[in-house]
Amino acid sequence: MRLSRDGVVVVHHDATVDRTTNGRGPVAGLTADELARLDAGYHFDGFRGRAGGVPRLDEVLRRYRDVRLIIELKLNDAQLAQRTVDAVRAADAVERVSIGSFGTRVLRAVREYEPRIPSGASREETRLALYRSWVRWPVRRPAYKEFQVPEMSGSTRVVSPRFVRYAHDAGVVVRVWTVNDESDMRRLLSWGVDALISDRPDRAVEVVRAAAR
């Protein structure tokens, strides 16, 4: 999530619209209406002219009322935290979302403003938890409810059977990104991870169903 020029929470990964749309410039330099008029599928085969514009968070929450969502905040900014929570409340979606970010400040703002919404560990919190797992020093009552993490960070292994056990002992679920290979999916599931974040949901659904049989 990012904020448009007029302070609306919009669903967009990059800081600029250049890579994915037919527009140019920073997301923060355009209003929500201007972002909505762009072609969000412009640079993707088969989606040019068909994907619509950059959506607002409240539109997505209302369109997919039966879907549980992870909302990632791309700015370490308290205003983004508050406006995101406001959108979640307005859509009556508090019970079906979790919020993640690399930034500690924005996650602390979410937790203070709406304690009912589960949040992921920030990069700093994840790093500390990983170190503690290496020395078998348990986390006591963490502020976060999820790890939303890659299996590897550079040359450092984040997710391992030990890390998953450590997280579960602390009451924290482990969601791993970005897992597109089926053999990786099966291995991670065998370690007990709670969710796979993937660019290939078609593969992931089949692997998860097979593992549950």
Q: What is each of the regions a protein language model found here?
A:
Residues 18-19, 107, 126-129, 203-205:
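Short gly/pro/ser/thr-enriched loop/turn and capping motifs at secondary-structure boundaries
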Residues 1-10:
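Short acidic, Gly/Ser-rich segments with clustered Asp/Glu that frequently serve as metal-coordination loops
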Residues 4, 78-79, 105, 182-183, ...:
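Short alpha-helical
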Residues 53-59, 125-136:
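Alpha-helical scaffolding within the catalytic cores
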Residues 47, 122, 130-213:
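C-terminal active-site rim and adjoining tail of enzyme catalytic domains
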Residues 10, 70, 98-100, 118-120, ...:
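Structural detector of well-ordered beta-strand residues that form the stable sheet scaffold
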Residues 13-113, 142-170:
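Metal-dependent phosphodiesterase/phospholipase catalytic core, i.e.
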Residues 1, 73-75, 101, 121-123, ...:
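A cross-domain feature marking catalytic cores of carbohydrate-active enzymes
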